[in-house]
């Protein structure tokens, strides 16, 4: 005899005796305390990784900067003979420190993503069925893999296109003086954002495997998701020309639709 638990309009069938072992009522205050504890662990881990990486922040800045912009540390600041070098300029005393913090925080953020998934699992574990626990645990290493793939996607495909567009868009009008904080902030924002964006397939598959929703329901609401993705992309991609938000939104929609297509092809959900 199987027990069926309704979750989000779908049924999750579990054999008798496989119900959540640790499921018990907890006061709201204890739930909030547990949630804060789990988030605290994630933030502390992010801070520790950022602190370890901080001494190497200048190397990270130089590596990222000259991966997408012309020039090198040996020719900056630019002279008349190297006027084509896109050297970083500091316009206030805190700009360099803030850029270093952003470089270190990017590393901490990428490492913290799978830890966040794991701590979410620990928070929800008492109410999960054994099969749901297995799905969630399998998602932890996959989260790190997807985060690294997202960073790589942004590094090799998105950022080069965006900065080539910026350079070509501005050259006929003015000589660009690249502000370190703003320009490097855009780099780290997009790298970190794509690490997060590439979690979309994981979240979709987890939600379906755990019976929270179905592929058919997600497909029927796709236009709402597309609109949400576009809104988030334009909110977190500070580019008044619209180039970066369009690329980010297209990537999010592509990941969402690709996941639904894969689930349909495999017959899951």
Where are these regions (language model features)?
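Membrane topogenic/interface segments and analogous intrinsically disordered interaction regions
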Residues: 1-269
């Amino acid at each position: 005899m199987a027990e069926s638990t309704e979750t989000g309009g779908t049924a999750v069938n579990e054999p008798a005796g496989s119900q959540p072992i640790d499921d018990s009522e907890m006061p709201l205050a204890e739930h909030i305390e547990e949630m804060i504890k789990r988030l605290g662990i994630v933030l502390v881990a992010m801070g520790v990784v950022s602190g370890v990486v901080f001494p190497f922040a200048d190397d990270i800045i130089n590596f990222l900067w000259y991966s997408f912009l012309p020039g090198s540390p040996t020719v900056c600041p630019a002279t008349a003979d190297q006027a084509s070098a896109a050297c970083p300029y500091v316009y206030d005393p805190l700009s360099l420190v803030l850029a270093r913090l952003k470089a270190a925080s990017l590393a901490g953020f990428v490492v913290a993503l799978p830890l966040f998934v794991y701590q979410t699992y620990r928070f929800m574990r008492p109410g999960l069925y054994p099969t749901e626990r297995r799905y969630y645990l399998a998602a932890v290493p996959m989260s790190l893999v997807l985060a690294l793939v997202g960073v790589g996607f942004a590094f090799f495909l998105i950022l080069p296109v965006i900065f080539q567009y910026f350079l070509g868009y501005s050259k006929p009008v003015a000589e660009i003086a690249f502000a370190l904080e703003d320009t490097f902030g855009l780099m780290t924002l997009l790298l970190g954002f794509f690490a997060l964006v590439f979690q979309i397939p994981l979240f979709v598959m987890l939600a379906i495997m755990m019976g929270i929703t179905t592929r058919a329901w997600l497909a029927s609401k796709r236009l709402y998701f597309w609109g949400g993705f576009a809104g988030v992309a334009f909110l977190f991609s500070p580019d008044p020309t619209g180039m970066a938000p369009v690329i980010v939104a297209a990537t999010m929609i592509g990941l969402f639709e690709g996941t639904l297509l894969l689930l349909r092809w495999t017959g899951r959900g």
